[in-house]
């Protein structure tokens, strides 16, 4: 009985995520994902996926730090966000304040959801 309940709950969680996550193509190589995550401002968290020949780049497009510090003046905030991103297994572009990771196609969903969670956490720094 417990195993059936666990499997049912697994399906329900998967269904919920699928129903509350929207993916659109913005061009021939880039997807925009509106995740089910909500940041500290109450806004939907977005993730972008750019397809390349041998990998996909999953990124925030530099948007979370732009939202927190539009003029890029808060060096401590940017450095803290960078440390958190790198510590979470992501890369950080110092020029564009973009958080990203390059992954195989099979790992895009996992990387996108983890990046959305990371953006939520970083949003509370502001």
Placement of each model-derived feature along the sequence:
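N-terminal ordered "arm"
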Residues: 2-59
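Solvent-exposed, charged helical/coil patches
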Residues: 97-126
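Short glycine-rich, low-complexity/disordered patches
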Residues: 22-33, 91-98, 124-126
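Terminal targeting/leader modules
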Residues: 14, 90-94, 103
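Secondary-structure transition/turn motif
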Residues: 34-39, 59-67, 101-106
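Generic hydrophobic, helix-prone segments enriched in Leu/Val/Ile
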Residues: 12-13, 80-86, 112, 119
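Intrinsically disordered, low-complexity regulatory segments enriched in Ser/Thr/Pro
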Residues: 45-82, 89-98
């Amino acid at each position: 009985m417990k195993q059936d309940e666990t499997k049912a709950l697994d399906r329900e969680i998967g269904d919920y995520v699928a129903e509350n996550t929207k993916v659109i193509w913005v061009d021939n190589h880039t997807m925009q994902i509106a995740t089910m995550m909500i940041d500290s401002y109450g806004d939907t968290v977005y993730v972008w996926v750019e397809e390349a020949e041998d990998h996909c780049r999953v990124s925030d497009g530099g948007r979370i730090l732009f939202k927190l510090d539009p003029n890029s003046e808060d060096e401590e905030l940017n450095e803290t966000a960078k440390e958190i991103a790198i510590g979470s297994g992501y890369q950080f572009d110092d020029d564009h304040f973009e958080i990203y990771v390059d992954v195989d196609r099979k790992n895009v969903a996992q990387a996108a959801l983890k990046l959305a969670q990371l953006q939520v956490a970083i949003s509370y720094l502001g």
